[in-house]
Swiss-Prot record:
<feature type="topological domain" description="Extracellular">
    <location>
        <begin position="149"/>
        <end position="182"/>
    </location>
</feature>
<protein>
    <recommendedName>
        <fullName>Taste receptor type 2 member 114</fullName>
    </recommendedName>
</protein>
<feature type="transmembrane region" description="Helical; Name=1">
    <location>
        <begin position="8"/>
        <end position="28"/>
    </location>
</feature>
<feature type="topological domain" description="Cytoplasmic">
    <location>
        <begin position="281"/>
        <end position="309"/>
    </location>
</feature>
<keyword id="KW-0807">Transducer</keyword>
<feature type="transmembrane region" description="Helical; Name=3">
    <location>
        <begin position="88"/>
        <end position="108"/>
    </location>
</feature>
<dbReference type="GO" id="GO:0004930">
    <property type="term" value="F:G protein-coupled receptor activity"/>
</dbReference>
<dbReference type="GO" id="GO:0008527">
    <property type="term" value="F:taste receptor activity"/>
</dbReference>
<keyword id="KW-0919">Taste</keyword>
<keyword id="KW-1133">Transmembrane helix</keyword>
<feature type="transmembrane region" description="Helical; Name=6">
    <location>
        <begin position="234"/>
        <end position="254"/>
    </location>
</feature>
<feature type="topological domain" description="Extracellular">
    <location>
        <begin position="1"/>
        <end position="7"/>
    </location>
</feature>
<dbReference type="GO" id="GO:0016020">
    <property type="term" value="C:membrane"/>
</dbReference>
<dbReference type="InterPro" id="IPR007960">
    <property type="entry name" value="TAS2R"/>
</dbReference>
<feature type="topological domain" description="Cytoplasmic">
    <location>
        <begin position="109"/>
        <end position="127"/>
    </location>
</feature>
<feature type="topological domain" description="Extracellular">
    <location>
        <begin position="255"/>
        <end position="259"/>
    </location>
</feature>
<keyword id="KW-0472">Membrane</keyword>
Length: 309
C-alpha cells in the first residue's frame, strides 16, 4: 500500500511520463509526415525521429517496470522477465544517448566556425563521424550485455520476499553499473566536449563581431546561443536522469523502500518530458506545427462554446 507522499510522487512521475510520450510522439510524427511528403528523410529528421522513438520506448519500459514493481512485484519473479527488461533498458537508453550525441555533433559541424584542418575534414565527412558513433554504440552493447547475463546467471539478482534484491557487495554493484553504462558515459563525454567547443566558437565569433563593430542583426550568434541552450539543457536533464536511475538501482540494495524508488523515478522522467518540449520550441519547423495545432484546438473550443450559447 502506497503512502500519501509516495502516491503524490507516483502521480507526478506518471504525468511526466505521459507528457514525454506525447511530446516525443509529436516530434516523430512531424518528421515522418515530412519524410512522406518530401520522399526523403534528411539527417536531422532521421536523428530527431530516432531520438523521439527511443525515448518513447524508454519511458514505456521504465513506467511499466515501476508499476509492476510497486503493485504486482510477483510478476517479475521469472528470471527471464527481469533479464528481458534489463536488455530492453540497455538498448533503449544507449540508443537514446547515441541519437542525442549525434544531434549535438550534427549541429556542431553545421554551426561552429573553426579553421582547423581536422574540423574542416570532419565537416566534409559527416558520414564517417556517424559511423564512428555507431561503432561506439555497438562496443557499448558488447560490454553491457555480458555483465547483465552474468548477474542473472549467477543468481545475484533474486526475487525474495515480494521484492527484487541484488546479492553482491556495494563495490561490485558500482563496478557492474559502470560497465553496463560505459558506452553512455563515453557518448556523454563526447557531448560535453562538443558543448565546450561550441561555447569557444561562440566566444570567438562574438569577439570578431565586436572588433568589426557590426550593427547588423547577427543570426549566427543567435543560432550559436540557441544550440548551446539546447545542449546545456540536455546535459543538466540527463545528469538528473542518471541520478534517478542510480537511485532506483540503489533501491535493489534497500528493499521495501517505495518512497526512495518513486522519488528516483520522478527525477528520471524529467529528462524525456522536459527535453522533448525544449526541442520542439528550439526547432522552428516543430514549433510552427505545435503552434498551429494549439491554434486549431483553441478555435475548436471557441466553436463549441459559440454553439452552446
Amino acid at each position: 500500500m502506497l503512502g500519501a507522499m509516495e502516491g503524490v510522487l507516483l502521480s507526478v512521475a506518471t504525468s511526466e511520463a505521459l507528457l514525454g510520450i506525447v511530446g516525443n510522439t509529436f516530434i516523430a510524427l512531424v518528421n515522418c509526415m515530412d519524410c512522406t511528403r518530401n520522399k526523403n528523410l534528411y539527417n536531422i529528421g532521421f536523428i530527431l525521429t530516432g531520438l523521439a522513438i527511443s525515448r518513447i520506448c524508454l519511458v514505456w519500459i521504465l513506467i511499466t517496470e515501476a508499476y509492476i514493481k510497486i503493485f504486482s512485484p510477483q510478476l517479475l519473479s521469472p528470471i527471464n522477465i527481469i533479464e528481458l527488461i534489463s536488455y530492453l533498458w540497455i538498448i533503449t537508453s544507449q540508443l537514446n544517448v547515441w541519437f542525442a550525441t549525434s544531434l549535438s555533433i550534427f549541429y556542431f559541424l553545421k554551426i561552429a566556425n573553426f579553421s582547423h584542418h581536422i574540423f574542416l575534414w570532419l565537416k566534409r565527412r559527416i558520414n564517417i563521424v556517424f559511423a564512428f558513433l555507431i561503432g561506439c554504440l555497438l562496443m557499448s552493447w558488447l560490454f553491457s550485455f555480458p555483465v547483465v547475463v552474468k548477474m542473472v546467471k549467477d543468481k545475484k539478482m533474486l526475487y525474495i520476499n515480494s521484492s527484487w534484491q541484488i546479492h553482491m557487495k556495494k563495490s561490485e554493484l558500482i563496478i557492474n553499473y559502470v560497465f553496463t553504462n560505459g558506452g553512455v558515459f563515453l557518448l556523454f563525454i563526447i557531448m560535453l566536449i562538443v558543448c565546450f567547443l561550441l561555447i569557444i566558437s561562440l566566444w570567438r565569433h562574438s569577439k570578431w563581431m565586436q572588433s568589426n563593430e557590426s550593427g547588423f542583426r547577427d543570426l549566427n550568434t543567435e543560432v550559436h546561443v540557441k544550440t548551446i541552450k539546447v545542449l546545456l539543457s540536455f546535459i543538466i536533464l540527463f545528469i538528473l536522469h542518471l541520478i534517478g536511475i542510480t537511485i532506483n538501482v540503489i533501491c535493489l540494495l534497500v528493499p521495501e523502500n517505495n518512497l526512495l524508488f518513486v522519488f528516483g523515478l520522478t527525477i528520471a522522467f524529467l529528462y524525456p518530458c522536459c527535453h522533448s518540449l525544449i526541442l520542439i520550441l528550439a526547432n522552428s519547423r516543430l514549433k510552427r506545427c505545435f503552434v498551429r495545432i494549439l491554434q486549431q484546438l483553441m478555435c475548436s473550443e471557441e466553436g463549441k462554446e459559440f454553439r452552446n450559447t
